[in-house]
Amino acid sequence: MEAAHSKSTEECLAYFGVSETTGLTPDQVKRHLEKYGHNELPAEEGKSLWELVIEQFEDLLVRILLLAACISFVLAWFEEGEETITAFVEPFVILLILIANAIVGVWQERNAENAIEALKEYEPEMGKVYRADRKSVQRIKARDIVPGDIVEVAVGDKVPADIRILSIKSTTLRVDQSILTGESVSVIKHTEPVPDPRAVNQDKKNMLFSGTNIAAGKALGIVATTGVSTEIGKIRDQMAATEQDKTPLQQKLDEFGEQLSKVISLICVAVWLINIGHFNDPVHGGSWIRGAIYYFKIAVALAVAAIPEGLPAVITTCLALGTRRMAKKNAIVRSLPSVETLGCTSVICSDKTGTLTTNQMSVCKMFIIDKVDGDFCSLNEFSITGSTYAPEGEVLKNDKPIRSGQFDGLVELATICALCNDSSLDFNETKGVYEKVGEATETALTTLVEKMNVFNTEVRNLSKVERANACNSVIRQLMKKEFTLEFSRDRKSMSVYCSPAKSSRAAVGNKMFVKGAPEGVIDRCNYVRVGTTRVPMTGPVKEKILSVIKEWGTGRDTLRCLALATRDTPPKREEMVLDDSSRFMEYETDLTFVGVVGMLDPPRKEVMGSIQLCRDAGIRVIMITGDNKGTAIAICRRIGIFGENEEVADRAYTGREFDDLPLAEQREACRRACCFARVEPSHKSKIVEYLQSYDEITAMTGDGVNDAPALKKAEIGIAMGSGTAVAKTASEMVLADDNFSTIVAAVEEGRAIYNNMKQFIRYLISSNVGEVVCIFLTAALGLPEALIPVQLLWVNLVTDGLPATALGFNPPDLDIMDRPPRSPKEPLISGWLFFRYMAIGGYVGAATVGAAAWWFMYAEDGPGVTYHQLTHFMQCTEDHPHFEGLDCEIFEAPEPMTMALSVLVTIEMCNALNSLSENQSLMRMPPWVNIWLLGSICLSMSLHFLILYVDPLPMIFKLKALDLTQWLMVLKISLPVIGLDEILKFIARNYLEDPEDERRK
């Protein structure tokens, strides 16, 4: 049934053809079940394990590696002689890498449990219905409830469907619907129609929503919608329709992978084609097929060389280390790739309650009557410090601390606050904080009484647990609470009937203490309290009181005001009818006005600084709240989202105002606005969508079930530590302390991580360029193999992997939060950087080939061949005139490979030092700024020595130990790379504009 909230109870009953007293007939139940289906949310069909595994192999680079492994395996199968074992090492290692990557990928996907499944926990098991086949109420499975059923709910029940209330069987009906609407206090319900068909859920005061809890009272209602048609069902559908997009880095790496795979394919084909003329060379035994296979193996080696196999592992390690650092700052990251996305966040959409504010209501102002002289009335106004539930703070008058006990009016005000109250404070010893027990508003009054300490109770030596309610206990010992007249909507107040405690010697009789909405309470006041006397309430006095309340309720403060009053001579207990709430109003008359307290959910202390940080970093903060617009704007001014006197006409909207705009203007509004008030969850998703259409990277906070679709849709969903399981599972990050400032710290960490990732991705790529150049040169010049695939894998995975990981520990730039967010479209490697890495890669490749050639031509223990012999070694036979007296097997010696590999590893270590900073010289940023890098370089070199000097590793890697002369030659060839990169950095610093600066302009 659509818009049930706007229909009268009679219309709802008529729509389903049902009577409130008897309920549906079995025949109607059957028809409705066929028409509407079962009252349950359909289970989400997850991907099978096999589908997840297959997904991991959809990446182009992974497929190229898999192909290389299969080809290597086939070639190894036909290998002869002692090379058989080493030939199998390469495909085996490649497969191991691919399996490890797939396991990590599947584990990550499985770990992000399905938020949709978490919604199931809000489905109640059972429900209580009236049906025509039985006289009394019957308990049935909640899934069997159908639209039109008459359902009974009572305190403690979970609402089984969306229900239109027909009648309330108690004084009041309070519902905790925070999971759905985010309202922090329980909501009082009624039965009258809500005329607005487009009312937001918060305003549907005659509806009970599936999954919410009855906090107090008992009621009868008719089921309007079930299953996926309920509000919680709509949320499920929104989440199911939201596809997870790839993070900017994942997109960049995918693009890079595609480009790399095209380049690899071209180079492999080119190498094979260049050497067609050599297929018949004597070294292949004159067999064309053997020659073709040999060059095919070189093409496979090229593919292995060009792909940075260690990159996925290094990225995962760097992100994992980043998540550990963030966890120390109270940001728990659930999805690794989102660590980097945080770095490009350009908009943060934050909930108000509990994130920008403390979600701990506190009284910050109060007043009592100072004196009344005819029509003249003056007030005593006080302000109170402290913005949490901790009983710490001072009462100030004209900014000077005072003792509350000196003012009789304050003593009575404190008495009303303590007694007209069902809440208390509790010190949580595990968390070390004071927490509320009961309603937020009442806890604020409890805290106020503790701060006022009107009877000068000695509290200094009390433990924190005893301190929590010390001053309230003193007041409660003086007066005994007999009974409570519960809050009701018609009078907007509640009261307690108290009698003096036996031990109390004060000459006071029974009293009624009242608190409630100012207009309602003040209308029933005939007197005002001045000191200990009471004076008649006159028109001007009333005007004065109401004008101050109005002033407090608007403007910068927008305080929530409560009026406090006493009935000095209440009726006798036995004369009062307590089961008829309609008569409570007449008992709460002839009141004496005592004072007013103004409270608010105060902004967190550190939020203002964090918002300034966001402004400096080019990040827009949008506050989204269910509060009314006035309160929302006031909080925005208070925390610095809006300036004190800034015009906010087109920068703040209510959900309704936003909906009334044409679509194009809605999109434009999202580009400008910084405040959305009175919004529904669907608005959050819409706002994210519009922001994404402007290429903004959005972080969205939320804690309720209602926030889950928007959390899932935003690039960074941020759930509160105190939020629901659904919100947490739909988000990328959880704030352990629910604090906005933690988001800003996480953004800073994300930026630092991206900068470091850029460095090590570029470092690994320049290494691969060098390897490709090396293999391409040997093939193009017709030289013997300088590096074989198993050696390349060792370099890519182990020796390069360690320094690359250590580059993740580079300290962040000092101005990291003074730059605008980077564009997600910014390339990983720009034109100049591409040239730089080609230049460095070219040097690496040439140096590696040069080292191998040096051994053949000039080394003391080498064969001393000529350049012609070296480049035509394929034609070497015993009877070939050009190779007279030369053992042809020398061209397969391990020494030149060892020289080439040692030069490659040493140059890569120098390159790691070059990567400490993109453009800063090593003179400005010496190696010891990152001690981890120095450690990893030492470890990489140790591992290189291991494969050179510890048997049987030299045999597996086809290497031989080097002597001192050879090592000196390795250093001579390797060290110039530092000088080359310093020259390129100098050019970048002095003659080319820094791309960061260019973007800032």
Swiss-Prot record:
Activation and inhibition: Inhibited by sarcolipin (SLN) and myoregulin (MRLN). Has also been shown to be reversibly inhibited by phospholamban (PLN) at low calcium concentrations in vitro. Dephosphorylated PLN decreases the apparent affinity of the ATPase for calcium and this inhibition is regulated by the phosphorylation of PLN in vitro. Enhanced by DWORF; DWORF increases activity by displacing sarcolipin (SLN), phospholamban (PLN) and myoregulin (MRLN).
Single GO biological process annotation from the record: positive regulation of fast-twitch skeletal muscle fiber contraction
Reported impact of residue 309 to Q: No loss of calcium binding. Strongly decreased rate of phosphorylation of the active site Asp residue. Interferes with conformation changes that are essential for ATP-dependent Ca(2+)transport
GO function terms (MF aspect): ATP binding; ATP hydrolysis activity; calcium ion binding; P-type calcium transporter activity
InterPro entries associated with the record: ATPase_P-typ_cation-transptr_C (IPR006068), ATPase_P-typ_cation-transptr_N (IPR004014), ATPase_P-typ_cyto_dom_N (IPR023299), ATPase_P-typ_P_site (IPR018303), ATPase_P-typ_TM_dom_sf (IPR023298), ATPase_P-typ_transduc_dom_A_sf (IPR008250), HAD-like_sf (IPR036412), HAD_sf (IPR023214)
Topology relative to the membrane: Multi-pass membrane protein
Residues involved in Ca(2+) 1 binding: 304-305, 307, 309, 796, 800
GO cellular component: endoplasmic reticulum; endoplasmic reticulum membrane; endoplasmic reticulum-Golgi intermediate compartment; H zone; I band; membrane; perinuclear region of cytoplasm; sarcoplasmic reticulum
Residue sites binding ATP per the record: 353, 442, 489, 515, 560, 625-627, 678, 684, 706
Residue numbers carrying Phosphoserine: 581
Annotated active site: 351 (4-aspartylphosphate intermediate)
UniProt: Ca(2+) 2 binding residues: 768, 771, 799-800, 908
The protein's role, per its UniProt record: Key regulator of striated muscle performance by acting as the major Ca(2+) ATPase responsible for the reuptake of cytosolic Ca(2+) into the sarcoplasmic reticulum. Catalyzes the hydrolysis of ATP coupled with the translocation of calcium from the cytosol to the sarcoplasmic reticulum lumen. Contributes to calcium sequestration involved in muscular excitation/contraction.
Name of the featured protein: Sarcoplasmic/endoplasmic reticulum calcium ATPase 1
